[in-house]
Amino acid sequence: MELWTSATPNGWKVSIMIEELIDAGAELGNTTVKHINLAKGEQHSPEFLTHNPNAKIPVLIDGDRSIMESCAILQYLGEKYPTSLLPDDNSRWDILPWVYWQAANVGPVFGNKLSYTRYMDAVEDEAKAHPLKRFGNEALRLVGVLEDQLNKHPWVAGNTFTIADIALYPWIRGWKWSKVDITQTPAVMDWVTRVRQRPGVGRGIAYGVPADEVDRWSPERRAQYRRNGAQITNPGK
């Protein structure tokens, strides 16, 4: 298998999944990782577009099959290598709705909040006020939904760590960067800590990141991400 990815929340979902599958005893065989430089536009290259016409990371190439969309990749890997991450019985339907919830709600809302918070310095504050309020309020509402779920049981979909946790964690862990205050949701805060303590998660979020910056970026790295994000958000500017 080949994973074409970058150090972003959606990219980290799949790298975490690979590492968690390894820890669960799945025999993945040889897996190679190709890091895509988003700032240089490598996702728009003809080679990349052959595998994902939507020009987004991550992409998983497994034999003659190319799979786009991070949550689809999670499900594909979970079905190909059955473990407790995605059981092959009806309990999967306690898990998959939360994966889709992440893709349809948390990712877009947190992504937009992040863009207006960090990547649109050229936009006047007055023009950003409404989207910042809208996406900020909706992000807090979604965190509240997650808080209610985690008050019922230790993991998102029940008593076991699954792909639902993997799908959500990379976005929630960046709450400071997106300026979504989760400190008033103690179950979510505790969950973030517990997920981070998993060895597979630690290895997964280290893909494409210097070892000493996995949990705290240097000022130079933060500035680089701001520049890269602004370039991607406002192409041609």
Task: Please state what every model-predicted region is.
Residues 98, 102-197, 237:
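GST-like fold's C-terminal all-alpha helical module
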Residues 84-88, 109-112, 155-159, 202-206:
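Short, hydrophobic secondary-structure boundary micro-motifs
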Residues 139, 198-215:
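Charged/polar, low-hydrophobicity segments characteristic of intrinsically disordered regions
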Residues 78, 171-172, 205:
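Active-site-flanking alpha-helical
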Residues 1-133, 222, 232-237:
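GST-like domain detector, emphasizing the conserved glutathione-binding G-site
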Residues 37, 163, 208-211:
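Short, solvent-exposed turn/loop segments enriched in Gly/Ser/Thr/Pro and often Arg
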Residues 208-237:
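Acidic/histidine-enriched, glycine/proline-rich intrinsically disordered or flexible terminal extensions
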Residues 72, 187, 200:
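Residue-level recognition of oxygen-bearing side chains
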